[in-house]
């Protein structure tokens, strides 16, 4: 018995690496020292551009969205999701992404599927001047089923220490600016899949009412906010804190980016919750608290700023074709207005 008979095809793995080479190397910046194929990716840190450079790292996956995306052949899109989930996290510190690494594990290597995944990852990196420096594709028969794969991503960025954004400058009456999400993004899919399981005609119902393809809406790739944030920082707009709205929604993620004696006061009527969320809530009979604590509800990213920067930020977002708006302000925890902030969710 040989290795191939046991379920691991080394030759197919070599062919796969050869086929993804063009997509991967297309993301490489001048700081990449060597191409793919070595044991470790080599990257020249651009320290001359920084006084006290700090590396910022993040790792994440796409969660159970993968299960649904694979069944509907949305492989390119989940590659973008993978980059977005990692990159959106590290830019909250003010970091500029440098390079990305991916890990793909599968029961049996399907080159057509995984080539689309890597092209999606490459697209996400390339659009944000981030080098796809390397990765690992593991064929694991018996551990994963034949047609399934899992993804993990790792992103590293850089920022000057004196320009780190950590929320320490947040103060009372600062404004909160919301940046619109691209839909459900990559969180809440265990609940979504259960709703679909319990409503076997859900896609047809959605299309009949809204004249949109249900899975096209549901599986849109996560928005990457790096370019618009980078433009703001380049134009010397002071951002005091940033929050990537992921699992836990606004109630869990927004308070994380500020000192504990402050809390976000959010006007929940300042935006229209997208139809995909309302539809899921109805079909799943989701309680209000779970609704807010599971989904982003149309808000993918938040900024905390002084009011003087509101108009410049809204204009930059408009130039980048991202909807943005003032969603609330910062109040002290002992402020009497706190009872008005999502009381049914936070209490």
Swiss-Prot record:
Ligase is among the record's keywords: yes
E.C. numbers: 6.3.3.1
Single GO term (MF): phosphoribosylamine-glycine ligase activity
Any one GO BP annotation for this protein: adenine biosynthetic process
Protein keywords: ATP-binding, Cytoplasm, Ligase, Nucleotide-binding, Purine biosynthesis
A cellular component term, taken from the record's GO annotations: cytosol
UniProt-annotated location(s): Cytoplasm
Reaction equation(s) it catalyzes: 2-formamido-N(1)-(5-O-phospho-beta-D-ribosyl)acetamidine + ATP = 5-amino-1-(5-phospho-beta-D-ribosyl)imidazole + ADP + phosphate + H(+)
Keyword Ligase: yes
Pathway(s) the chain acts in: Purine metabolism; IMP biosynthesis via de novo pathway; 5-amino-1-(5-phospho-D-ribosyl)imidazole from N(2)-formyl-N(1)-(5-phospho-D-ribosyl)glycinamide: step 2/2
Family stated for the protein in its record: Belongs to the AIR synthase family.
UniProt xrefs under NCBIfam families: purM (TIGR00878)
HAMAP family per record: AIRS
Protein name as catalogued: Phosphoribosylformylglycinamidine cyclo-ligase
Phylogenetic classification of the source organism: Bacteria, Bacillati, Cyanobacteriota, Cyanophyceae, Synechococcales
């Amino acid at each position: 018995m040989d290795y191939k008979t046991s379920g691991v095809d080394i030759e197919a793995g070599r062919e796969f690496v050869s086929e993804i080479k063009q997509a991967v190397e297309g993301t490489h910046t001048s700081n990449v020292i060597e191409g793919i194929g070595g044991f470790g990716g080599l990257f020249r840190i651009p320290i001359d551009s920084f006084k006290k450079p700090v590396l910022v790292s993040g790792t994440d996956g796409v969660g159970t969205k993968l299960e649904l995306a694979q069944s509907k052949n949305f492989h390119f899109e989940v590659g973008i999701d993978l980059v977005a989930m990692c990159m959106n996290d590290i830019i909250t510190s003010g970091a500029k992404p440098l390079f990305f690494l991916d890990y793909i594990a599968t029961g049996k290597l399907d080159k057509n599927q995984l080539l689309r995944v890597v092209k999606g990852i490459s697209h996400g990196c390339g659009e944000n001047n981030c080098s796809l420096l390397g990765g690992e594709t593991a064929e694991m028969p018996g551990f994963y089923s034949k047609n399934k794969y899992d993804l993990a991503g790792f992103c590293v960025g850089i920022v000057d220490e004196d320009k780190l954004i950590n929320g320490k400058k947040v103060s009372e009456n600062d404004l909160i600016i919301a940046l619109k999400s691209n839909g459900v993004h990559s969180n809440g899919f265990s609940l979504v899949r259960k709703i679909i399981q319990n409503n076997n005609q859900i896609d047809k119902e959605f299309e009949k009412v809204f004249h949109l393809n249900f899975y096209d809406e549901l599986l849109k790739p996560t928005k990457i906010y790096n370019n618009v944030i980078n433009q703001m920082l380049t134009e010397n707009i002071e951002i005091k804190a940033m929050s990537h709205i992921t699992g836990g929604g606004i109630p869990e993620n927004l308070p994380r980016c500020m000192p504990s004696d402050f809390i976000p006061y959010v006007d929940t009527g300042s935006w229209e919750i997208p139809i995909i969320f309302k539809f899921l809530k109805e079909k799943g009979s989701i309680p209000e608290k779970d609704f807010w604590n599971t989904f982003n509800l149309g808000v993918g990213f938040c900024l905390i700023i002084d009011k003087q920067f509101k108009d410049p930020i809204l204009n930059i977002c408009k130039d980048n074709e991202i909807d943005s708006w003032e969603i609330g302000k910062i109040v002290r925890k002992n402020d009497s207005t706190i009872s008005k902030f999502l009381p049914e969710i936070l209490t």
